């Protein structure tokens, strides 16, 4: 694509169409842009539109399209072609910083994000001048430009907070510090000075405080991994100014908005974060500054209001106190009982209160409320911070803290008892305080795993939680109902089984509660109960416990999916899945109704899949229905196919990318249940499964390979008879997969099924080409993973077609190649093969090479016979060699760039591991002994002679053990 006016105009028109609400207009435009994004100059055309277009909408659209293009294509992935030519890469990097800094804020943010994506891949090696170019702009004096640089630097450096330590990372951080830390500190001081100069100019202050907020964020990123020498030397400058900013109260920066945090609140909360980082990680160096920060942050907490806009600030301020009180150095600051009482009264209790804003979220934004309250994303909430502070204080002062707080709990409960309808929030706070006091350690899987022994959890449950849950009106006091359910869910590992069983019928009833939060918590609690471990391998709650409730449980779970706001509630669907798994055969009488409802739901959500977890659990539930029913009655598979295939056809024809990998897995499960030949409905689909477009999507590959394996296992004769013209297509898929380091193992799965199941005459003409393809890959890109799979394939081929066929195949491609493979690949690498079935295949195959291949005894290959036997005994007896060469790395599926529906393995569609040898060989060691005995009988004297002269003593001892176990000897 040339950088021409015509192309700019054409691109403008297509970008306009991508904004059209009509899918008939929008989708073709999106497809067109997708089709041309591989052309040279495409990114430069987008940047030209960002710079020159007169239409602001097109400018923004171009910037967003450019950022997404960079996100999808900039990373160079091994095995894949470079999606952006080198000339475009150089041109983009040479122009983007200038363009970003000249652009308005809305566009600047998009381009800044694009720079950080490029920097993540190219900085510092391929973009060494990036930082210098950015730092030079600090001198401009233009804070629009400076903030653009700071925003980009923040995007670039914030990953330092999350990355594991490595020499490579530290080298990069050192380079950044050498170039950036000094100018950043100078800018910090200059900006503080300007704030003092312009203290009465609200416009200037807004720009300057935006800069200070970004500078404070950069400070956090650059100090996160370790305390850099530069910042240690300049701690006085940074900490003094941070402290001054914490205590600053400029009325001009206060906002009337009760929801949205202002610039001053954002800056102060970031400073609290920075102080907490230093208190936790660099307490010795930070000690001189700590008392003044504790005082400033305490004053901040007792003077800040309850408005939502202060939530982040208060949360970070409390988290600072929590991190300080956990350190042995500082415990003397908190040990006075009056201090503990003051903290409880002035910080913890006020910030545990259920505010009007929380009530509003509970009722009107339940999804967000659940996410924060149940899933632990409440990291920035006042309640979570107050809870963390309670736990922190309990580390050194558990007894005094429990006594003080118990008094508050009793007082709150008494207030509630006086007038429940008015004072229910007191009980809510009491439950939250008890939960905070009692929980010392928690996991997602088990709830609270370690509790404060000074708190009697069961007594509190019986006296204060159970009465609420037993209330006849399931819709009264919904917040307290949710609190009660959450309490028993959190402390399920501490509460006796008998009490849990009492709550099960109550929870089933709460599935019908009007409140989304309440019926969601009920579903989640049931699901968690059903996964609790009991004695040995059983669950704590077993199917027999649930027998009185099966019908009501299933009915209420499915009814809950029709309640307003819960039509795609992932917790309910997960509870359905877990109920099926626990109840097993008990659900069979309800399957016709259940599968009908699941199918209707599948059809509805396939129109616009938006809840990935819900969708995943739905497919798991479908798989469980199939497995449980067909285990008892395999013929029932036909009724599932009747119910599901219409919806599956719709999904495949509409190309619902998110669901296609799931559909293939369910179809594999159904096909594997068939015991006779493949039904015609499957054979009609077979040619479509080989279409290249399906294999372009990474997420389709594992389930598609499994589905093709199911076709080969169940219907090889049908394929050979009526679809032999599709065998080249099958091998084409194998060839594509084998060329990829990420997917070569999938290629071998498919190839092994082809070799094992298709009649020999069907693949005779292709065998040589298969070996050539494998050798080309071995020569161009040898990896441990490939070699392991290659060895399994060779031995499977040997078992299927015989050792002579294997040797002749190699030597027909190139003379003496068989010897090279045995010497250079099989003998040195066989120890790397892992997995019992894979090892068994290799053992049987190598036994055949040793004992059924005449050239191993009578030609120059004879010198390899004993080393090969030694290697086979090593495979039996030595630990697996799991070393991987230093220079080798594997590309994971997750690393493929851009959005692709990732493959999600369905646990309940799991494939039983297939053993191609099966009962033919139970003990490969005995097989080796018997085969050597047979060989030695055919050529007396030779085998004992070869073994005694070349096999090492330890291997010889093992071999004698095999011969003894097999009741045979060598002659």
Swiss-Prot record:
InterPro entries named among the record's database cross-references: ARM-like, ARM-type_fold, Importin-beta_N, XPO2_C, XPO2_central
Compartments (UniProt record): Cytoplasm; Nucleus
Any coiled-coil regions, as ranges: none
GO cellular component: cytosol; nuclear envelope
Keywords: Cytoplasm, Nucleus, Protein transport, Transport
Recorded superkingdom: Eukaryota
Domain Importin N-terminal: start-end pairs: 29-102
Main location: cytoplasm
GO MF annotation, one: small GTPase binding
GO biological process terms on file: protein export from nucleus; protein import into nucleus
Pfam families reported in the protein's UniProt record: CAS_CSE1, Cse1, IBN_N
PANTHER family according to UniProt: EXPORTIN-2, IMPORTIN-7, 8, 11
Function: Export receptor for importin alpha. Mediates importin-alpha re-export from the nucleus to the cytoplasm after import substrates have been released into the nucleoplasm.
Membership in a protein family: Belongs to the XPO2/CSE1 family.
Stated name of the protein: Exportin-2
Species lineage: Eukaryota, Metazoa, Chordata, Craniata, Vertebrata
GN (gene name): cse1l
């Amino acid at each position: 694509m040339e950088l021409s006016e015509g192309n700019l105009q054409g691109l403008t028109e297509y970008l306009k169409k991508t904004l059209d609400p009509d899918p008939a207009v929008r989708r073709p435009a999106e497809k067109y842009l997708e089709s041309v994004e591989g052309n040279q100059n495409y990114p430069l055309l987008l940047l030209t539109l960002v710079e020159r277009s007169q239409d602001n909408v097109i400018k923004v659209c171009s910037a967003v399209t450019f950022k997404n293009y960079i996100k999808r294509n900039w990373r160079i992935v091994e095995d894949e072609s470079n999606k952006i030519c080198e000339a475009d890469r150089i041109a983009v990097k040479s122009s983007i910083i200038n363009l970003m800094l000249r652009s308005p804020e809305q566009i600047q943010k998009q381009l800044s994000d694009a720079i950080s994506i490029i920097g993540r891949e190219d900085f510092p090696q391929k973009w060494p001048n990036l930082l210098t170019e950015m730092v030079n702009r600090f001198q401009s004096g233009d804070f629009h430009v400076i903030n653009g640089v700071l925003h980009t630097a923040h995007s670039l450096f914030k990953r330092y907070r999350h990355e594991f330590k490595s020499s490579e990372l530290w080298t990069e951080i050192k380079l950044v510090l050498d170039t950036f830390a000094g100018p950043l500190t100078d800018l910090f001081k200059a900006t503080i000075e300007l704030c003092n100069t312009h203290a009465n100019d609200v416009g200037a202050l807004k720009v300057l405080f935006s800069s200070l907020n970004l500078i404070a964020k950069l400070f956090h990123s650059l100090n996160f991994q370790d305390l850099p020498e530069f910042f240690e030397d300049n701690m006085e400058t940074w900490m003094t100014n941070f402290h001054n900013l914490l205590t600053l109260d400029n009325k001009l920066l206060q906002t009337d908005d009760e929801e949205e945090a202002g610039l001053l609140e954002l800056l102060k909360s970031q400073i609290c974060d920075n102080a907490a980082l230093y208190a936790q990680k660099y307490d010795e160096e930070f000690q001189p500054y700590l008392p003044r920060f504790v005082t400033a942050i305490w004053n901040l907490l007792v003077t800040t209001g309850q408005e939502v806009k202060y939530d982040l600030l208060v949360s970070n301020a409390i988290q600072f106190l929590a991190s300080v009180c956990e350190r042995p150095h500082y415990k003397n600051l908190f040990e006075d009982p009056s201090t503990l009482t003051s903290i409880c009264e002035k910080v913890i209790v006020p910030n545990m209160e259920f505010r009007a804003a929380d009530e509003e979220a509970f009722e009107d934004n339940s999804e967000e409320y659940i996410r924060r309250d149940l899933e632990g994303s409440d990291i920035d909430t006042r309640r979570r911070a107050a809870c963390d502070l309670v736990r922190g204080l309990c580390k050194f002062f558990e007894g005094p803290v429990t006594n003080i707080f118990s008094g508050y709990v009793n007082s709150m409960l008494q207030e509630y008892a006086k007038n429940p309808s008015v004072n229910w929030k007191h009980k809510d706070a009491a439950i939250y305080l008890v939960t905070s006091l009692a929980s010392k350690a928690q996991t997602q899987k088990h709830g609270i795993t370690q509790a404060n022994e000074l708190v009697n959890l069961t007594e509190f449950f019986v006296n204060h939680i159970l009465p609420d849950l037993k209330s006849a009106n399931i819709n009264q006091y919904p917040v307290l109902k949710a609190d009660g359910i959450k309490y028993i869910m959190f402390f399920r590992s501490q509460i006796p089984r008998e009490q849990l069983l009492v709550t099960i019928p109550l929870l089933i009833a709460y599935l019908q509660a009007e409140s989304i939060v309440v019926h969601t918590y009920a579903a989640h609690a049931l699901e968690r109960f059903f996964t609790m471990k009991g004695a040995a391998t059983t669950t704590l709650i077993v199917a027999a416990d649930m027998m009185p409730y099966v019908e009501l449980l299933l009915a209420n779970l499915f009814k809950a999916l029709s309640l307003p706001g819960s039509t795609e509630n992932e917790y309910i669907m997960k509870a359905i899945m877990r109920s099926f798994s626990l109840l097993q055969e008990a659900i069979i009488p309800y399957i016709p109704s259940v599968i009908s409802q699941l199918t209707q739901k599948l059809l509805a959500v396939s129109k616009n899949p938006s809840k990935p977890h819900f969708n995943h659990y739905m497919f798991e539930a479908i798989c469980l229905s199939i497995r449980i029913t067909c285990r008892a009655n395999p013929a029932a598979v036909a009724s599932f196919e009747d119910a599901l295939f219409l919806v599956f056809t719709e999904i495949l024809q509409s190309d619902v990318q998110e669901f296609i990998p799931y559909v293939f897995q369910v179809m594999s499960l159904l096909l594997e249940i068939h015991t006779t030949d493949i039904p015609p409905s499957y054979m009609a689909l077979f040619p479509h499964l080989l279409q290249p477009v399906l294999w372009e999507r990474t997420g389709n590959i594992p389930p598609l390979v499994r589905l093709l394996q199911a076709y080969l296992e169940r219907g090889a004769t049908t394929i050979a008879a009526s679809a032999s013209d599709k065998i080249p297509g099958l091998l084409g898929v194998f060839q594509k997969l084998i060329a990829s380091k990420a997917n070569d193992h999938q290629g071998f799965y498919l190839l092994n099924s082809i070799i094992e199941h298709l009649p020999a005459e069907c693949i005779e003409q292709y065998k040589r080409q298969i070996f050539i393809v494998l050798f080309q890959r071995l020569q161009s890109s040898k990896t441990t993973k490939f070699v392991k799979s290659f060895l399994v394939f060779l031995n499977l081929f040997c078992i299927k077609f015989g050792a002579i066929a294997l040797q002749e195949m190699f030597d027909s491609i190139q003379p003496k190649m068989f010897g090279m493979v045995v010497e250079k690949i099989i003998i040195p690498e066989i120890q790397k093969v892992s997995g019992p079935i894979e090892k068994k295949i290799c053992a049987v195959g190598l036994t055949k090479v040793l004992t059924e291949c005449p050239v191993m005894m009578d030609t120059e290959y004879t010198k390899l016979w004993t080393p090969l036997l030694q290697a086979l005994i090593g495979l039996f007896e030595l630990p697996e060699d799991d070393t991987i060469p230093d220079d080798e790395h594997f590309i994971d599926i997750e690393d493929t760039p851009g959005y692709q529906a990732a493959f999600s393995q369905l646990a309940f569609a799991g494939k039983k591991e297939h053993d191609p040898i099966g009962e033919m060989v139970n003990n490969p060691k005995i097989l080796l002994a018997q085969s050597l005995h047979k060989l030695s009988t055919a050529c007396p004297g030779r085998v004992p002679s070869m073994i005694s002269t070349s096999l090492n003593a330890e291997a010889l001892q093992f071999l004698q053990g095999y011969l003894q176990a097999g009741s045979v000897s060598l002659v």
